[in-house]
């Protein structure tokens, strides 16, 4: 079993180097305007600055991270450039917010998830459409897509006008345990990144999606500081492990409990 895991990690390392390019998610490529119709931006009424991302999973519900909770949250949908407003941009406020734990007591490696019910549903449009929840967990080595308006510099807060995207790999959880000594032996998180560094989510990307094969498999949670260091992958809340809770809440069971 140990040998298989070592071989798998070596294969992923080779794949990571094969995919290396000039793009970084901290400085990466501008997303195609049509590839992120489900991506939303969270900001507060006072700041007007995006502090987190989120994912539209149906016309009335948005998935994000517990760490992204704020008073007076606003949710922007259909946005690409912050300088040029699409005709179908919509803004919503939460009607209800649900957490596995209090947004103040989640841990970095457990239950960093928030489900937001919008006060008014949104309509599908050219730049707005939900993404599917996962039918199965992602496979080790899967190439997945991360995106957001987070900082594009590992050393200073430099936020782009448009969302940036990059491809990263699903890694064995043991890679993240080796990188972060305090991680428990098991957790309901995904370990994902590029082993040699360079591609990573960063400040301002929290709450945004990890998309694998057209499904939202992860929620950006946390990672190394500064972002994008070699062998310091990111941690993503594992959406598949929370499916029953998500579906129960949406169905109207407000007392649904998260997996232990």
UniProtKB/Swiss-Prot annotation:
Pfam families: Trypsin. The keyword GTP-binding does not apply. GO terms for cellular component: extracellular region; secretory granule. Keywords: Disulfide bond, Glycoprotein, Hemostasis impairing toxin, Secreted, Serine protease homolog, Signal, Toxin. Glycans are attached at residues 83, 123-124. GO terms for molecular function: serine-type endopeptidase activity; toxin activity. InterPro entries: Peptidase_S1_PA (IPR009003), Peptidase_S1_PA_chymotrypsin (IPR043504), Peptidase_S1A (IPR001314), Trypsin_dom (IPR001254), TRYPSIN_SER (IPR033116). GO terms for biological process: proteolysis. Residues 25-251 form the Peptidase S1 domain. It is found in: Secreted. Belongs to the peptidase S1 family. Snake venom subfamily. PANTHER family: KALLIKREIN-1, KALLIKREIN-RELATED. This is Snake venom serine protease homolog 2A. The gene is TLG2A.
């Amino acid at each position: 079993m140990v040998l298989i895991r070592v071989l798998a990690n070596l294969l992923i390392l080779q794949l990571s180097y094969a995919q290396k390019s000039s793009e970084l998610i901290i400085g990466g490529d501008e997303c195609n305007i049509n590839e992120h119709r489900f991506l939303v931006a969270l900001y507060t009424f006072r700041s007007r600055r995006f502090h987190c991302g989120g994912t539209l999973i149906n016309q009335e519900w948005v998935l994000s991270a517990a760490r992204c909770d704020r008073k007076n949250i606003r949710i922007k949908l259909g946005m690409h450039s912050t300088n040029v407003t699409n005709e179908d941009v919509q803004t919503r406020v939460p009607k209800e917010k649900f957490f596995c734990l209090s947004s103040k007591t989640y841990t970095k490696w457990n239950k960093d998830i928030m489900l937001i019910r919008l006060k008014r549903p949104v309509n599908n449009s050219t730049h707005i459409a939900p993404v599917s929840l996962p039918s199965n967990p992602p496979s080790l080595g899967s190439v997945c897509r991360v995106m957001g308006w987070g900082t594009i510099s590992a050393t200073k807060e430099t936020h782009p006008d448009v969302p940036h995207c990059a491809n990263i790999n699903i890694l064995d959880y043991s890679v993240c345990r080796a990188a972060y000594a305090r991680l428990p032996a098991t957790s309901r998180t995904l370990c994902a990144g590029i082993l040699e560094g360079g591609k990573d989510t960063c400040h301002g990307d929290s709450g945004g999606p990890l998309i694998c094969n057209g499904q939202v498999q992860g929620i950006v949670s946390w990672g190394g500081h500064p972002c994008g260091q070699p062998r310091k992958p990111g941690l993503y809340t594992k959406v598949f492990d929370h499916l029953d809770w998500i579906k129960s809440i949406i169905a109207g069971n407000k007392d649904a409990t998260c997996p232990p």
